[in-house]
């Protein structure tokens, strides 16, 4: 019998675990429709702010040999644009899973207002709160401030009752894994997304003796193959620390079916693809699904749950 890539996530059944990372192929309704027609299991909107944002000056995204560097600055069409889209799609395709919604306020108050808009709407899908954008000048990554993160989540769950996940930055210290997991376990969070890009990297054009992006003197978030070991470590660390009801989306360095398998083996249930989706287009989902299925067949697994989270240690 052929293996299945079907996964259950936050009360929804998806035909496979793949989706776009917020920021790629999700800015406009045309791009979101392209995602809907693709072989991905799900898709997510661009991280929305209260009003439309142009983002940082260009050049702000550059593909580099093992990934990408970006300092986009949260360009988006605003919450009303994306909420209108998901509600319209929800009405037109009632038997389908709604898209994920992503929000990223520029302040605590803005995050609360954005989530109130979603809570007060008829949206039946899953929302992702981005607490980890490293590319807005003058704005720190919220999720590196543990006390502030705790305060935000406490305020959010006073009113928000729909499924809510949190997108996290990468952590590099066991004490930080412990501290953040302790906070997350206090709240009815549906999932965590590990990880956003690794913030404030630098890539240099040696011929020009110059940085390659304009914002922040060339400092930007690193994505792609560079960050896969860090992403896997974060997925695994949180899988081992979070209570069983909190699921994990693995994001970072997924280019092949083997990369996807590794994220799932570490404990992820869904997978987001950013850099390689930007490079290859939506055809990447069909390819990675096929490669992942082939791995399951070779290993004799019938489903993702046969191996998810079962990474072995060396005794």
Swiss-Prot record:
Can the keyword Metal-binding be found in this entry's annotation?
no
GO terms under biological process: 'de novo' pyrimidine nucleobase biosynthetic process; 'de novo' UMP biosynthetic process
Query: Which reaction(s) does its UniProt entry say it catalyses?
Result: (S)-dihydroorotate + fumarate = orotate + succinate
Needed cofactors, names only, are: FMN
Class of enzymatic activity (EC top level): oxidoreductase
The record lists FMN as bound by 46-47, 130, 167, 195, 224, 252-253, 274-275
Query: Per the UniProt record, which EC number(s) apply here?
Result: 1.3.98.1
Tell me how the cofactor is bound: Binds 1 FMN per subunit.
| Keywords tagged on the record | Cytoplasm, Flavoprotein, FMN, Oxidoreductase, Pyrimidine biosynthesis
GO MF, one term, reads: dihydroorotate dehydrogenase (fumarate) activity
Q: Which GO terms describe its cellular component?
A: cytoplasm
Q: Where, by residue number, is the active site?
A: 133
Q: Which family does it belong to?
A: Belongs to the dihydroorotate dehydrogenase family. Type 1 subfamily.
Q: What else is known?
A: K.lactis has two isoforms of DHODase, a cytoplasmic isoform and a mitochondrial isoform.
NCBIfam families with a match to the protein in the record: PRK02506.1 (NF002702)
Q: How does it assemble?
A: Homodimer.
Q: What is this protein called?
A: Dihydroorotate dehydrogenase (fumarate)
Its lineage opens with:
Eukaryota, Fungi, Dikarya, Ascomycota, Saccharomycotina
């Amino acid at each position: 019998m052929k293996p299945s890539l079907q996964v259950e996530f936050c009360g929804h059944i998806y035909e496979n675990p793949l989706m776009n990372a917020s920021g790629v192929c999700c800015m406009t309704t045309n791009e979101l429709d392209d995602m809907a027609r693709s072989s991905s299991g799900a898709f997510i909107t661009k991280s929305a702010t209260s009003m439309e944002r142009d983002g940082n000056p260009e050049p702000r995204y550059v593909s580099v040999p093992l990934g990408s560097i970006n300092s986009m600055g949260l360009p988006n069409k605003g919450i009303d644009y994306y909420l209108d889209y998901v509600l319209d799609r929800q009405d037109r395709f009632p038997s389908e899973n709604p898209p994920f919604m992503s929000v990223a306020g520029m302040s605590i108050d803005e995050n609360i207002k954005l989530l109130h808009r979603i809570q007060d709407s008829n949206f039946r899908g899953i929302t992702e709160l981005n607490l980890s954008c490293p590319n807005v000048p003058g704005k720190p990554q919220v999720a590196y401030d543990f006390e502030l993160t705790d305060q935000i989540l406490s305020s959010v769950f006073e009113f928000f009752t729909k499924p809510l996940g949190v997108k996290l930055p990468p952590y590099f210290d066991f004490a930080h894994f412990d501290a953040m997991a302790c906070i997350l376990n206090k709240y009815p969070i549906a999932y965590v997304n590990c990880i956003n890009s690794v913030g404030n990297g630098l890539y240099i054009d040696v011929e020009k003796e110059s940085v390659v992006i304009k914002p922040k003197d060339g400092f930007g978030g690193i994505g792609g193959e560079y960050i896969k070991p860090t992403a896997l470590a974060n997925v695994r660390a949180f899988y081992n620390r979070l209570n069983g009801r909190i699921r994990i989306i693995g994001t970072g360095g997924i280019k092949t079916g083997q990369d996807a398998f590794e994220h799932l083996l570490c404990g992820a249930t869904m997978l987001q693809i950013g850099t390689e989706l930007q490079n290859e287009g939506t055809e990447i989902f069909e390819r990675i699904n096929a490669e992942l299925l082939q791995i399951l067949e070779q290993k004799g697994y019938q489903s993702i749950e046969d191996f998810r989270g079962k990474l072995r240690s060396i005794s």
